[in-house]
Amino acid sequence: MKLVFLFLLVTIPICCYASGSGCSILDEVIRGTINSTVTLHDYMKLVKPYVQDHFTEKAVKQFKQCFLDQTDKTLENVGVMMEAIFNSESCQQPS
């Protein structure tokens, strides 16, 4: 299950360009996702505009809880991975 959530997070930036994701809203959601000090309640307030139904809300809660269950080192590594993706050649903004 953890691998599924990780792949979900990894596929988000495929549509984005530039340093970071190039999308401030996406960057904020990713930071909230991998930040262990962001509570489930605060995270749900952050993503509320994008949660349209009860099923999505339940999935988002499980998604965040997965990250809350990880060690700080694992969360730090996810952040490093996201930066590597955003700074990769395939994610660079065209000149």
From Swiss-Prot:
Residues 1-18 form the signal peptide. GO terms for cellular component: extracellular space. Glycans are attached at N35. Induction: Androgen dependent, as shown by the decrease in the level of the protein following castration. Pfam families: Uteroglobin. It is found in: Secreted. PROSITE patterns: SCGB (PS51311). Disulfide bonds: none annotated. GO terms for biological process: androgen receptor signaling pathway. GO terms for molecular function: protein-containing complex binding; steroid binding. Keywords: Glycoprotein, Lipid-binding, Secreted, Signal, Steroid-binding. It comes from the Eukaryota. Belongs to the secretoglobin family. Lipophilin subfamily. Part of prostatein which is the major secretory glycoprotein of ventral prostate gland. Steroid-binding protein; can bind non-polar steroids, cholesterol and a group of small proline-rich peptides. Prostatein is composed of three different peptides called C1, C2 and C3. These form covalent C1:C3 (F) and C2:C3 (S) heterodimers whose non-covalent association forms tetrameric (C1:C3/C3:C2) prostatein molecules. This is Secretoglobin family 2A member 2.
